[in-house]
Amino acid sequence: MSLTEQLLRPLLASPAKPLITHYDDQLGSRVELSVATTLNWAAKTANWLVDEFDVEPGDEVAVQLPAHWQTAGILLGAWWCGARVVPASAGARVVFIGPDASVDAPAVAVVSLDPMGRGLSTPPPGGALDYLTEARMSGDQFTPLSPIPGDTPALESSTVDEILTEARARAEKLGLSAADRALSTLDWTIPDGVLDGFLVPLAASAHLVQITHADPAKLDRKREAERTTTDLG
């Protein structure tokens, strides 16, 4: 079973439960995603990766993005179809980059990072694709063509089973549970940032309050407003 299915299966009984709250202090934005909405974006991404790029289990997908709710959907979608998430573009079926970045690769998906989920205002150059505009047309449900084995690489060289075991162990060490609301300012570097800042709270079914471009002067107010119970960093 894929990493995404194993992480989200315990949450399916409460689809309306808030799962990710994303702040961008540079933009002054706040976006909240429920379990259902997160699952929806993951499914759209997985379908798009399979249909547009023929991604199969073990294929590399490069993700060069900040901690963001859109990045969450991309990561979960990639794992759902069995992709191996890597930071480097060489050998990747597709490279996901932000709107101000550029990369020399055969297949590039540009992610607008717009808080409200709008696509790019102008078409990306060089044959690159607008991820949000393209992927939102894909299906809201996804089923892998075949089960994803636990020894499939999922995050650089670590397998599905290894990542899940490590994320659960770190969550247990932190005392995280489904009742927690975890505030994080960690960047989602690959692999450590993604593991500590994204997978650990998911493994505990905790609510993640992720702050990008965090303003230190506003953190205490956010802790109070979001009723967070712990800090991840």
Which residues fall in each region the model found?
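Short beta-strand->loop structural element characteristic of the AMP-binding/adenylate-forming
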Residues: V63-Q64, T71, L75-V103, A109-P123, ...
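ANL superfamily adenylate-forming
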Residues: V94-L174, R223-G233
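Conserved AMP-binding/adenylate-forming core of the ANL superfamily
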Residues: T21-V55, G150-L176
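A generic structural signal for well-ordered alpha-helical segments
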Residues: L11, A78-W79, P201, R223
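A short N-terminal helical cap/helix-turn-helix that marks the beginning
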Residues: M1-T21
